Regions:
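N-terminal Rossmann-like FAD-binding beta1-loop-alpha1 element of flavoenzymes
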Residues: 6-30
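Glycine-rich loop(s) and the adjacent beta-strand/alpha-helix scaffold that form part
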Residues: 194-227
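Structural detector for helix-capping/boundary residues
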Residues: 11, 155, 193-194
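Anion (oxyanion) recognition and catalysis
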Residues: 23, 93, 224
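Short amphipathic alpha-helical face segments that pack within enzyme cores
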Residues: 17, 134, 138, 217-225
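Conserved N-terminal/central alpha/beta ligand/cofactor-binding core
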Residues: 27, 32-186, 204
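Core beta-strand elements of the Rossmann-like FAD/NAD(P) dinucleotide-binding domain
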Residues: 2-4, 184-194
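Hydrophobic/aromatic ligand-binding patch that stacks against planar heteroaromatic rings
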Residues: 17-22, 40, 195, 222
């Protein structure tokens, strides 16, 4: 059994960005069931919507999102994501992510903002048409060279370990995770009081999907079983 301050399951943009921040506060391990770059992030094209221009605003972006969401969006969540997006983009750029730029009418360099369906303003930051690959490659390079982060590739998260499953008294909480070391054919135990599921979605449960074949909802199932 190996113990860490933080366990991260998944190696896409969510898992890698969390690991880089958490590493300032303790030891981190990332467990991912394939090679680290094979998550859905690398397949993401388009770009990232973020208010960047004077003609745009948070309120306009929120309104566009709510209209496109057709009543399915939680407005508070939408507003939080929209208002925190500029700082998140600055963090990505600090990590070395390069978004496409252009020259304005006065010869100054600026972000080459795109406009996609459902957006009334130009607000899409992109890196050609392979934005996800650019983000993934830069974050993964930083993770691999960070002395406080351990990356376990080909380690399939099998199940969360909870106090209830161990028969311990008190409120049920997660204390670790079982992972299958696919190279060795062994189930290993990772121990931590802080476990973050960054396992993506479950698009592959449907017959027709553009999701990669790893999007099988493993994290969703583990969370449900943990209660």
């Amino acid at each position: 059994m190996r113990s860490y301050d933080f366990i991260v399951i998944g190696s896409g943009i969510a898992g890698l960005s969390f690991a880089l921040r958490a590493a300032a506060h303790g030891s981190v391990v990332i467990a991912t069931k394939r090679s680290a770059e094979q998550g859905s992030t690398s397949w993401a094209q388009g770009g990232i919507a973020c208010v960047q221009s004077q003609e745009d605003s948070f309120d306009i972006h929120v309104a566009d999102t709510l209209e496109a969401g057709a009543g399915l969006c939680d407005e508070a969540v939408v507003r939080t994501i929209v208002t925190e997006a500029p700082a998140a983009m600055e963090t990505l750029m600090d990590y070395g992510v390069v978004f496409d730029k252009r020259m304005d009418e006065e010869g100054h360099e600026e972000l080459d903002l795109g406009r996609e369906g459902g957006h009334s303003k130009r607000r899409i930051l992109h890196s050609k048409d392979t934005t996800g690959r650019e983000v993934e490659s830069k974050l993964l390079a930083l993770v691999k060279e960070h002395p406080g982060i351990t990356l376990l590739e080909q380690h399939f998260a099998v199940d969360l370990i909870t106090t209830a499953k161990l028969g311990l008294a008190g409120p049920n909480r997660c204390v670790g995770v079982y992972v299958l070391d696919q190279a060795a054919g062994l189930v290993r135990t990772l121990r931590s009081d802080r476990i973050v599921l960054c396992t993506g979605g479950c698009g592959r449960v449907y017959q027709y999907t553009t999701n990669p074949d790893i999007a099988t909802g493993d994290g969703v199932a583990m969370a449900w079983r943990a209660g």
